[in-house]
Amino acid sequence: LEKEFERVNDIRDFNQRKVLKAFFDNKVAPEHFYTVSGYGHDDLGREVLDKVFAQVFCAEKALVRIHFASGTHTLACALFGNLKYGDKLLSVAGAPYDTMQEVIGTAGDEETKRSSLIGNGVLYDEVPLVNGMDVDFAKLEEMVDEKTTMVLIQRSKGYSTRKSLSMQTIGRICNIVKAKNPDCICFVDNCYGEFVDKQEPLEAGADLVAGSLIKNPGGGIVEAGGYIAGKELLVERSANRLTAPGIGSEGGAMFNQHRLIFQGLFMAPSIVSE
């Protein structure tokens, strides 16, 4: 097992250097650990936190907020923020996990479905897995067309028996999608995937990623929240869904959680490697 442990340690060290560089480049200092109350306007710590996450994940912009109730809520904001009536969403690795099925509208009671993407007029389809295990690249190429607005790429296998997606697989998916429709948004559910590799999905061709701070990037100590990162326009649209149009990423008091989130991110590469 020595070679495997060496591989994990190499990934840990690479990602730790990446996080440290983001802290250094953005001049993280004690004044960024404090927050403001009320509307949360002009919160310097929140702005720097967003910039640090954006650099770590190689994004144009990041939205790091404790107001996300869960990973599912974070993903829902990204989906609802970037999809409107008549748009089409395609899940590329079979059905997503249970809570996301309720967000999309393929599961849940009638009231849940009424509030879902499908209930709001978004079209949905999914690419079945090969033998319930692997992405069907040929079928993906067949199903993506000019009407496909967004593809959902669930990186982790969740509670299913399929394989989690490697960076190589995510890159191949994005290449196929962009070749068929350059305007299609490649959105990666990055929950449980942060810092398990030297690359993150945006480096492999994705346009948008989202995840939970109570999982990998929170280092096991962040108490709540999530993040969305990627192209600036897509992130800001997601922010409009989290708060409101006209507020977007400019508002939202952080309740003195900056320091813990900075600390969690600092610890994350080491904690994930363990």
Where does each model-flagged region fall?
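Glycine-rich phosphate-binding segment of PLP-dependent enzymes
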Residues: L1-A59
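Conserved PLP-enzyme active-site core in the AAT-like
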Residues: N9, K18-D25, A29-H32, Q55, ...
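Short, well-structured beta-strand/strand-turn elements
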Residues: E60-H67
